[in-house]
């Protein structure tokens, strides 16, 4: 067979992408495929495959449904970050802003909707509704319906127990008085120097999934609830 480098995909006229693997494969695929190309995710890993629409045992039925037009689009909000004018790839799940030095707890500032908050903490997690069943859920944040146009702010090990906050989809600016890492969907890491401003905002267009089964809160069902 033949293979295509990720950068080549953006120059090819594609109608549909199949992501075969786990959720990590799906997240990675959305960062490298052309923005408006829909994706069908097939889970063949050992994990839940929360983002997937089909498993290894239902691939034939899924492809038949797509070829016969029995499918629909599922749009998901994405976000991007800008660090001193340099824009990162889009994130479908989340951005984690976290300290590097494990012996000092930094003071991080958070500005959104004309308000500013400062707190000593290990990090800040900014999640989309899609990401609310990922890292955000593991740190105790609530699950959001996938269709909502909002963001979840989850402080990590806040000294004064700063609560999680759900806000409308507005720009969020983050700073730290110590060097930090900015992690995109748990996969790509960008170093942020102390005092640098990180601005998180909506990315257009939304991610497009191909779905064949209508469900209310599909990600919640994958968690076993």
Can you say where each PLM-predicted feature lies in the sequence?
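ATP/nucleoside-binding phosphotransfer catalytic cores, i.e., glycine-rich phosphate-binding loops
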Residues: 84, 89, 97-98, 102, ...
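Gly/Ser/Thr-rich active-site loops/lids in small-molecule metabolic enzymes
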Residues: 118-161
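N-terminal glycine-/serine-/threonine-rich phosphate-binding loop
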Residues: 1-35, 68-69
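Proline-centered loop/turn at the N-terminus of a beta-strand
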Residues: 38-40
């Amino acid at each position: 067979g033949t293979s295509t480098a990720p950068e080549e995909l953006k120059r090819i006229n594609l109608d549909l992408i199949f992501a075969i693997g786990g959720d990590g494969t799906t997240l990675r695929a959305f960062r490298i495929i052309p923005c408006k190309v829909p994706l069908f995710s097939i889970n063949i890993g050992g994990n839940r495959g929360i983002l997937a629409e089909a498993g290894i045992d239902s691939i034939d039925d899924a492809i038949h449904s797509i070829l016969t037009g029995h499918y629909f689009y599922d749009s998901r909000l994405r976000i991007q970050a800008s660090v001193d004018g340099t824009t990162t790839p889009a994130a479908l799940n989340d951005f984690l802003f976290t300290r590097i030095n494990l012996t000092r707890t930094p003071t991080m500032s958070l500005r959104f909707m004309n308000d500013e908050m400062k707190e000593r903490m290990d990090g800040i997690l900014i999640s989309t509704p899609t990401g609310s069943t990922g890292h955000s859920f593991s740190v105790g944040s609530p699950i959001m319906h996938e269709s909502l146009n909002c963001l979840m702010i989850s402080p990590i090990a806040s000294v004064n127990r700063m609560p999680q906050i759900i806000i409308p989809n507005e720009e969020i600016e983050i700073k730290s008085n110590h060097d930090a890492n900015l992690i995109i969907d748990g996969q790509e890491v960008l170093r942020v120097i102390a005092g640098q401003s990180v601005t998180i905002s909506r990315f257009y267009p939304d991610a497009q999934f191909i779905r064949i089964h209508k469900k209310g809160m599909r990600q919640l069902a994958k968690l076993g609830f």
